Amino acid sequence: MIALFNKLLDWFKALFWKEEMELTLVGLQYSGKTTFVNVIASGQFNEDMIPTVGFNMRKITKGNVTIKLWDIGGQPRFRSMWERYCRGVSAIVYMVDAADQEKIEASKNELHNLLDKPQLQGIPVLVLGNKRDLAGALDEKELIEKMNLSAIQDREICCYSISCKEKDNIDITLQWLIQHSKSRRS
């Protein structure tokens, strides 16, 4: 009976309450940030993606949640912008190319440098290891270890292994993000 009441209440809320959240998507170049945005926006994977120059902003609506998503370029010249676009967001999404093990150390260093910024303290982080469909890609446990995620103690942090190409774990990623938009406001 209570479960039925909760479902009815959720349906009623969806009719009248619209939720908004703001996310910043960062990570090294070619990790799949723009591809991720396109997959969650349209469900389409495009093999021929052009690297983001500077930043792109896109609004995506999923159910009663509108997501304002900042996709920031991952080339070295744009990394100084990451902090500015991460201030005040509901969550930071950090994309890692899990199949490019040569860049894991650089990716780890960039993530930890970003999270050391005082103005970003407490903002939840979702680390996504993309390209799990490729041979040799790190799984979640390996990503947590190689990215030294257990050392991050001042905020909630979560890690998923995904494939934008195969659309693996995209739904669970969105669920985590939407849940976070709710928990940050309560």
From Swiss-Prot:
Q: Where is this gene product found?
A: Late endosome membrane; Lysosome membrane; Cytoplasm, Cytoskeleton, Spindle; Cell projection, Axon
Pfam families registered for this protein in UniProt? Arf (PF00025)
In the record, what terms sit under GO molecular function?
GTP binding; GTPase activity
The UniProt record lists the keyword Cell cycle: yes
> Which top-level group of life is the source organism from?
Eukaryota
Its function, per the record, reads: Plays a role in lysosomes motility. In neurons, mediates the anterograde axonal long-range transport of presynaptic lysosome-related vesicles required for presynaptic biogenesis and synaptic function. May play a role in chromosome segregation.
Protein name (Swiss-Prot/TrEMBL): ADP-ribosylation factor-like protein 8A
Q: What is the lineage of its organism?
A: Eukaryota, Metazoa, Chordata, Craniata, Vertebrata
Which gene produces this protein?
A: Arl8a
